[in-house]
Structure formats: C-alpha cells, structure tokens
C-alpha cells in the first residue's frame, strides 16, 4: 500500500542525523523541510510518498505551528539507505530528531501513521498528541482478523517475491492499479504514481514487509498521550465498497481497542489518501483535533 509542490517560503533542509552528513559516512534516514513558527508538528508521509502530500496541511498550519515535513530515505527520489531493519531505523532516527527539536504533535499517514504510533509506544514523552491518518496497528488483520506475525510470513514472502520480479512496466501498472483504490482523482493518482516510480523498489519491499509483519495492537496500551485517528470510509475494490461506514468504524475500534485515550473519526467518502480525497473533511477534522 502507498502512500510536487513549492511553497513561497524557502524550506530549511536538514538530515535525519544530529551530525553534519559531511562528517558522517552514514546516509540520512530522511530529509526534512521546516516551515512556519510555533509549536512543532512532525509530519510523516506514507509508503513511497513524498512529504509533499502534506502541502495543504502546511499551508493551513504554518502561521501557528512549526511544520517539520519528512520524506523518508528511498522514497520519492530520496537516496536509499542500507541500514536494516528499515522501519526500526526510521523509528530510531525520527525519535532522535524529535528529541533534538522538542516534543510536539506527531502526525503520520499510512506507514507514517504506523511509525507515529511506534514512536509513542517507545517514548510518549516525545509526543504531545498523535494524529494518525488511515493507519492501523496491524495491517494484516484488516483482511484476516485472526492473523498473527507468524501466520503472515508466507504472504509477506510472496509479496516480496512478486514485487522484486516485476519489470518496470509491470511495476508501474501494479502501482497505478493500487493507487486507483486509494485515490479518486486522476490528477492526484498521477502525482502519487510519480512519487512511487521515483522510489527505490527494494526500500518499498523492505518497508512493506516490515509493516505487514509488525503487530502493535497490544503495545499501543503503553501510549498515555491523546491519539486522534482518521480512517478512510471508502475501502473499495473494482469500484465496489468492501465495508459500510459502520463496519469500518468497527474495524478501527477493534484494532485500537487497547489504546485508552483515543478519538476515531471516519471519512465516509474518502479513500486512503484522505487529505486528497476529501480535503474539506480532513482539514475540518484536523482543526478539531488540534483544538482539543
């Protein structure tokens, strides 16, 4: 699952390391563009996505917040890294970055939402509140409620094999088909497809494999800070909705049942990229979350 713009302000580009990269052989785990001033908001995009997915969000928040917009290594044209496991590397270096710049609101979409949860689990003193955009503690259990980290091993290995063996034409077609289930507007599909095709395929496979096989459903009980969760109500395949709004709400409640202080809101008509599919609902709901 996945997940080109320029603001008038010139962004500050920093790496996901505390040292000057020229003095450190380790490649940065991410780049960051910083906009505005105020309390920090850390914005993490999803799989194979650019930080540009937060363009509209930054425009609305930069007068009140200092927006730290990440693009993860290997995605949307950013140089990949060799450090593994990929997701644990991202979590550690994101935590180091937040620790260096001050606790704040951590907001993530898709894979970024998963990382936001994982950061709060590891050290919720870094997180004043979490805003999760269409992400779940255990992705595999959405389709297979009885799934465990062990039982999804075969599916994970099959996914890795299939994606690795595709040629570029097959991969583009597969990504376009997948994105069409996640975004309604063709122009936005093409934007996300461009990010995906600029991404390093090995990084996509490694990140997706880790996401499929990491279950945070029990661990989220450790989170004591407020967590606000937006979920897409339009989960479709071949143009047909798979779940009603009520069923989507139930799925989210089940996945997040061990999280004590939470608010779950369903964007009834939006697909996975909620900020693209229903921006009015997204920004209205986001403002409510920020004001609480």
PLM region descriptions:
Residues 1-25, 227:
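Bacterial Sec-dependent N-terminal signal peptides
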Residues 33-80:
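Conserved HGGG/HGGXW glycine-rich cap/lid loop of the alpha/beta-hydrolase fold
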Residues 69-107, 111, 276:
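Active-site loop/oxyanion-hole signature of alpha/beta-hydrolase fold enzymes
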Residues 113-124, 130:
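Short glycine-enriched nucleophile-adjacent loop
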Residues 121, 129-165:
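Flexible "cap/lid" loop of the alpha/beta hydrolase fold
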Residues 163-219:
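Conserved alpha/beta-hydrolase catalytic His-Asp/Glu region
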Residues 227-270:
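Conserved loop-alpha-helix segment in the C-terminal half of the alpha/beta-hydrolase fold
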Residues 267-279, 283:
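Catalytic histidine-centered segment of alpha/beta-hydrolase-like enzymes
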């Amino acid at each position: 699952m996945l997940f080109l713009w320029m603001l008038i302000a010139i962004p500050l580009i920093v790496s996901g390391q505390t040292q000057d990269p020229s003095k450190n052989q380790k490649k940065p785990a991410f780049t960051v563009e910083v906009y505005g001033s105020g309390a920090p908001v850390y914005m993490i995009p999803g799989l194979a996505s650019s930080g540009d997915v937060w363009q509209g969000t930054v425009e609305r928040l930069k007068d009140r917040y200092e927006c730290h917009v990440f693009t993860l290594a290997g995605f949307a044209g950013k140089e990949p890294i060799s450090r593994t496991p990929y997701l644990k590397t991202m979590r550690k270096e994101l935590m180091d970055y937040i620790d260096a710049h001050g606790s704040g609101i951590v907001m993530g979409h898709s894979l970024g939402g998963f990382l936001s949860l994982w950061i709060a689990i590891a050290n919720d003193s870094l997180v004043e509140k979490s805003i999760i955009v269409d992400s779940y503690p255990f992705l595999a259990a959405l389709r297979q409620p009885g799934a465990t980290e062990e039982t999804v091993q075969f599916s994970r290995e099959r996914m890795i094999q299939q994606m690795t063996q595709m040629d570029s034409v097959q991969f583009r077609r597969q990504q376009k088909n997948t994105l069409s289930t996640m975004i309604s507007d063709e122009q936005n599909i093409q934007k996300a497809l461009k990010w995906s095709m600029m991404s390093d395929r090995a990084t996509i496979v490694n990140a997706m494999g880790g996401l499929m096989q990491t279950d945070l459903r029990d661990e989220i009980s450790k989170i004591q800070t407020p967590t606000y969760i937006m979920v897409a109500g339009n989960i479709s395949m071949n143009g047909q909705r798979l779940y009603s709004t009520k069923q989507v709400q139930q799925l989210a409640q089940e996945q997040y049942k061990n999280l004590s202080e939470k608010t779950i809101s369903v964007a009834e008509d939006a697909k996975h990229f909620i900020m693209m599919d229903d921006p009015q609902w997204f920004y209205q709901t986001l403002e409510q979350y920020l004001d609480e």
